[in-house]
Amino acid sequence: MATEKTYPMTQEGKEKLENELEQLKTVRRKEVVERIKIARSFGDLSENSEYDAAKDEQAFVEGRITQLENMIRNAVIIEDTGEESTVVTLGKTVTFKELPDGDEEAYTIVGSAEADPFEGRISNDSPIAKSLLGKQIGEKVVIQTPGGEMQVEIISVK
């Protein structure tokens, strides 16, 4: 039997997924069922775009519910000790400077389930995170990105 994929995430990330799941089950699911009922009342389902759209949305909502239930069931919580560290690990915020004289950037490395690059949270599967994980403050690291290679120096890990 194949083992199920685990989803590393913070407690905060798990709670966000649980809230989204609750919203989908209690609100969105009911809204979609109501849209399907209304669309059915329009008659002929073979050329009923409202019905087709509502059924598509229902499939999306049910798929997302299944996905969230699986992620929550297989969540592995990353403990945040709140302490500074010298080593980059999952759940830590790492600040680095692009060399030779670039700007400083900071990212929190999280599991893919809660990654949001616009909020400074990158997936542990991303090229940047893969290059930084396990490295220490002061180390110079070469990162392979889709845009090319960049060299950075790790400034802090929190």
From Swiss-Prot:
The gene is greA. Necessary for efficient RNA polymerase transcription elongation past template-encoded arresting sites. The arresting sites in DNA have the property of trapping a certain fraction of elongating RNA polymerases that pass through, resulting in locked ternary complexes. Cleavage of the nascent transcript by cleavage factors such as GreA or GreB allows the resumption of elongation from the new 3'terminus. GreA releases sequences of 2 to 3 nucleotides. It comes from the Bacteria. SUPFAM superfamilies: FKBP-like (SSF54534), GreA transcript cleavage protein, N-terminal domain (SSF46557). Belongs to the GreA/GreB family. Keywords: Coiled coil, DNA-binding, Transcription, Transcription regulation. Residues 3-75 form a coiled coil. Gene3D superfamilies: Transcription elongation factor, GreA/GreB, C-terminal domain, Transcription elongation factor, GreA/GreB, N-terminal domain. GO terms for biological process: DNA-templated transcription elongation; regulation of DNA-templated transcription elongation. Pfam families: GreA_GreB, GreA_GreB_N. GO terms for molecular function: DNA binding; RNA polymerase binding. This is Transcription elongation factor GreA.
